A protein has these predicted regions:
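Polytopic transmembrane helical bundles with strong interfacial aromatic enrichment
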Residues: 1-136
Length: 136
């Protein structure tokens, strides 16, 4: 089960890296439309949370230390924060126009994305240590 846990954390890290790629694809798509960020939304709202839940289940079954289980579920919590950032940013927007306050809030979306990447990387390192039998 430790190999499954490691594999899921590796897939989670890959999904997070792809999330940044999909964000860039959406940002530079011409013409801009609601579907420009379709892959970014799908990956962020479905794939990353699913992999986080599966990695957490695998970690628990593999009986890894509690810190590693916490790292496995942390991306799901941070995805919830991502959604809240967008909702709050929209609340500070003025119809179709983005206000300076909304831009500050939306900027937190990118910073939180970096936090998700850091947690996914720590998760992968913890799974690798577990697999190799090295002390955490």
């Amino acid at each position: 089960m430790q190999k499954v846990y490691f594999g899921l954390t590796a897939l989670l890290q890959l999904a997070v890296v792809l999330q940044f790629y999909f964000a860039a694809v959406g940002a530079f798509s011409k013409p801009q439309s609601d579907s420009s960020y379709g892959l970014h939304s799908l990956n962020g709202m479905m794939i990353i949370p699913l992999l986080s839940i599966l990695a957490t289940i695998a970690a628990a079954i593999a009986r890894v230390p509690g810190r590693a289980i916490g790292l496995a579920i942390a991306p799901l919590g941070l995805v919830v924060v991502q959604v809240l950032i967008i909702v709050i940013g929209k609340a500070f927007s003025d119809g179709d126009d983005t206000t300076p306050a909304a831009l500050v809030i939306y900027g937190l979306h990118a910073i939180n994305g970096l936090a998700i990447m850091a947690v996914a990387g720590a998760n992968l390192r913890a799974a690798r240590q577990q697999l190799s039998g090295a002390p955490a």
